[in-house]
């Protein structure tokens, strides 16, 4: 993991709501709806501006009893998609010695 990744943390964007839609769970903003599966929803909920991506990977592995080598690329891809779609923003990650 690069120094830049360690210093940036994903945080949910404001104005996004979680709703149950006809086809499953949705992340709903002012202009768009994003259908998400259980794993993506769990990941989005971890985007609190305090949790590092590597900690998210560990949490998803534990929650879904899945191996890290399978989870890590998926988590990074979903975080990139969330950022591209405006569902999260990357914030400064100076958390001290947490």
Residues of each region from the PLM?
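Acidic, low-complexity/disordered tracts enriched in E/D and polar residues
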Residues: 1-45, 91, 95-96
């Amino acid at each position: 993991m690069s120094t830049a990744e360690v210093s940036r943390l994903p945080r949910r964007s404001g104005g996004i709501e979680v709703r149950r839609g006809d086809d499953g769970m949705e992340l709903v903003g002012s202009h768009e709806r994003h259908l998400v599966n259980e794993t993506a929803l769990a990941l989005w909920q971890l985007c609190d501006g305090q949790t590092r991506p590597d900690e998210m990977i560990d949490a998803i592995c534990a929650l879904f009893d899945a191996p890290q080598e399978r989870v890590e690329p998926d988590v990074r891809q979903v975080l990139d998609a969330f950022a591209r779609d405006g569902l999260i923003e990357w914030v400064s990650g100076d958390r001290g010695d947490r």
